[in-house]
Amino acid sequence: GLPVLDALLPLDCALFRKSQPWRFYAGPTLALELSGSTAWLAGHANPAELAGFLSFCGCESAILDDATCSPPDGWRKAETLTVFGLPQAGLLPLPAVDEALWTQLTLCREASAARVAAALYPADLTRQADFYSELCTKRSRGRAVAWTLEQESAVVCTVGAYALCNGQAYMACGQTAEPLRGKGIGGRLIVEMANSLATEGLRPVFLCAPERVRFYTRLGFAKLAEYARYVPEK
């Protein structure tokens, strides 16, 4: 199946098809999820019809596999998104970290949804509330996990797997507090989670923006596929 898309779309549709701000559409050859102003597409459709539909929906970006899905007419590629996962050899060695700092941190594998949301979206209360609701809904059904590193009860690093579905674990929202970046704690946490998910029989996958490709390659993750993010021509 398609990495990321085959985890995210079916799970979100099953849990949120009657919920705002999600909208889902399925045609004979296309599955489409709208979340906020971003569309996720799997399959293919007529490019002119797709452009009209996305415009009608107020969509500002679309993530798709342009090897199989022609982009909407009048849209341009904004960036290539790399899909990463574990290499065929299996689990990754834990990367180097500032050991003195690491020993001060507490790993929480059942992190508070409210605290994860606040750490990720401190200035956006609406996004914070949406994220909190989504995480609680998924986690109560065993479909998501969120980990944090905490220092004196403050969340300083987090990563999660926010769609456990169809044998995949879609990892996202890795973030380290600004003062502690560059010390290796984010990379260590991401590798630990990916290895843990793999030992549970899941296939960890995640999408990576161009500026982060070197970081994940250095950690030892393998490129599995490429998707593209398209935006309307202004």
Give the predicted meaning of each segment.
Residues 72, 215-217, 221:
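Conserved active-site tyrosine of GNAT-family acetyltransferases
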